């Protein structure tokens, strides 16, 4: 039987892609290992809940990976139904409940795989709310469980340190002055850098993250999608902290390569634009805006007078939350598409982000600060404007702006709304100012460092090799 590593990704698209790319990376450098990826699959007639999590949209991606990388095996596992009394939760938190209720199904799948292969390790996405002991207790041999942290070392430091600061957050939660929080290896942060769901330390989300931190501390190791050159202080703090028992394996940047997706004419349009002249605006698979915010973005782009390629989700979010898809003409200011057709391109719903960022014409990126997107921009040397929307993205913004210094931050009001003037000013500053040039030079150096980390003898390659050696010896 072949030595097998089982990867168990979260339902979210960004988490799935990152885990699949980790599997590809392992196979590239350690082909003697076999990779099986567990995929939670909704019932034949999916509920609105599971549809919200875009399980169906992942099917096309999985089919593409199966066709292009047949050495990766996908093992489908039934997704458990949620109890009727489950509270309303945003998608990234809802996925926690779905995985938690699917623990028994995952355990059965692992028992099935163990009969046909030699399981050497199980790698679980940190956002899968499963107790590793419950998953592995019925396996004949002691299979080590590792956690894959799909974001960076800085947010991992916050997560693992959160149980330490949580009592203070509760004690100070009603004070008017913002609490200054010092996490080892990071700049000083405040509660404003936390995910929106964690502003109240007594919230459901905070209780979940406390449990996740506790669970991760019991793993055999934590695999992190980062590299030393961009988060040196955070990595050092985690590695040297005696209170963080699991060894750290920084194997990044683990990013997706363009794999022949339909480009909707984006690349042909970019071919006609001058070098480093276009700003890409793309906000991830869950990045939806209200009608008012979309119009404000459009006005801001006109004010910036820059070339742009804007990916617009036609399902509204925010105050206008709706699954109904509207036309671009219904969503954008009257005449906007006609007025900007010489300088801009607007694409509905989706575009091949990795391929676009790698194009010579792209010189800036307005991003939601999802970590996969940040790493893709770093690997292509594209400077950023940071506009976080959900999950850990506000913390990522702090890292991008203060620690890495590869982005400008947009300032939103207390409701999260960004004005056209603010967006237009930040885009123009990125593309035309001396500060923008400094950021461009800095991120180009990080691009070189990313390549070095992944090359033979690099820090990330060394971490991967060390990890694979442990697996083979287990």
From Swiss-Prot:
It catalyses: a 7-hydroxyisoflavone + UDP-alpha-D-glucose = a 7-hydroxyisoflavone 7-O-beta-D-glucoside + UDP + H(+). CDD domains: GT1_Gtf-like (cd03784). An anthocyanidin binds at residues 15, 391. Monomer. The lineage of its organism: Eukaryota, Viridiplantae, Streptophyta, Embryophyta, Tracheophyta. Expressed in shoots, leaves, cotyledons, epicotyls, hypocotyls, roots, pods, seeds and flowers. The keyword Magnesium does not apply. Its EC number is 2.4.1.170. Changing residue 392 to A: Loss of catalytic activity. Changing residue 456 to A: No effect on catalytic activity. Belongs to the UDP-glycosyltransferase family. Changing residue 125 to A: No effect on catalytic activity. Residues 1-49 form a propeptide. Optimum temperature is 45 degrees Celsius. It is an enzyme of class 2 (transferase). This is Isoflavone 7-O-glucosyltransferase 1. Keywords: Glycosyltransferase, Transferase. The active site is at residues 15, 125. UDP-alpha-D-glucose binds at residues 150, 351, 353, 368, 371-373, 376, 392-393. One of its GO terms (molecular function) is glycosyltransferase activity. InterPro entries: UDP-glycosyltransf_plant, UDP_glucos_trans, UDP_glycos_trans_CS.
């Amino acid at each position: 039987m072949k030595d097998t590593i089982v990867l168990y990704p979260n339902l979210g698209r960004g988490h799935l892609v990152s885990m699949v790319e980790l599997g590809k990376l392992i196979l590239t450098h350690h082909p003697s290992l076999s990779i099986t990826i567990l995929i939670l699959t909704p019932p034949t007639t999916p509920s609105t809940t599971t549809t919200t999590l875009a399980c169906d949209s992942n099917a096309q991606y999985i089919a593409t990976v199966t066709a292009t990388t047949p050495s990766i095996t996908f093992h489908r596992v039934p997704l458990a139904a949620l109890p009727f009394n489950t509270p309303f939760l945003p998608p990234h938190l809802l996925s926690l409940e779905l995985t938690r209720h699917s623990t028994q199904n995952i355990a059965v799948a692992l028992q099935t795989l163990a009969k046909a292969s030699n399981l050497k390790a199980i790698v679980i996405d940190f956002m899968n709310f499963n107790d590793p002991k419950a998953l592995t207790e019925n396996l004949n041999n002691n299979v080590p469980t590792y956690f894959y942290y799909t974001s960076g070392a800085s947010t991992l430091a916050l997560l693992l340190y959160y149980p330490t600061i949580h009592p203070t957050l509760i004690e100070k939660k009603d004070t008017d002055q913002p609490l200054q929080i010092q996490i080892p290896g990071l700049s000083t942060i405040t509660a404003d850098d936390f995910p929106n769901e964690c502003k109240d330390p007594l919230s459901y989300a905070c209780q979940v993250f406390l449990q996740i931190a506790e669970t991760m501390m019991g793993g055999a190791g934590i695999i992190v999608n980062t590299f030393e050159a961009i988060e040196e202080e955070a990595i050092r703090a985690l590695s040297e902290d005696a209170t963080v028992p699991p060894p750290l394996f920084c194997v990044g940047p683990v990013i997706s390569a363009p794999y022949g997706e339909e480009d909707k004419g984006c690349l042909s349009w970019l071919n006609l634009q001058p070098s480093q002249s276009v700003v890409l605006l793309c906000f991830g698979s869950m990045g939806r805006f209200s009608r008012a915010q979309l119009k404000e973005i459009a006005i801001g782009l006109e004010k910036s007078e820059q070339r742009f390629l804007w990916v617009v989700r036609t399902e509204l979010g925010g105050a206008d939350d709706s699954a109904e898809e509207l036309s671009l003409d219904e969503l954008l200011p009257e005449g906007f598409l006609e007025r900007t057709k010489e300088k801009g391109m607007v694409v509905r719903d989706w575009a091949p982000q990795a391929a676009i960022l790698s194009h010579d014409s792209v010189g800036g990126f307005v991003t939601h600060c999802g970590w996969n997107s940040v790493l893709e921009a770093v690997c292509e040397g594209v400077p950023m404007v940071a506009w976080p929307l959900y999950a850990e993205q506000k913390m990522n913004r702090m890292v991008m702006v203060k620690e890495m210094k590869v982005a400008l931050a947009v300032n939103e009001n207390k409701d999260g709304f960004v004005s056209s003037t603010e967006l237009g000013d930040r885009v123009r500053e990125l593309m035309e100012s001396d500060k923008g040039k400094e950021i461009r030079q800095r991120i180009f150096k990080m691009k070189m460092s990313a390549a070095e980390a992944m090359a033979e003898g690099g820090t990330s390659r060394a971490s991967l090799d060390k990890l694979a050696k442990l697996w083979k010896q287990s």
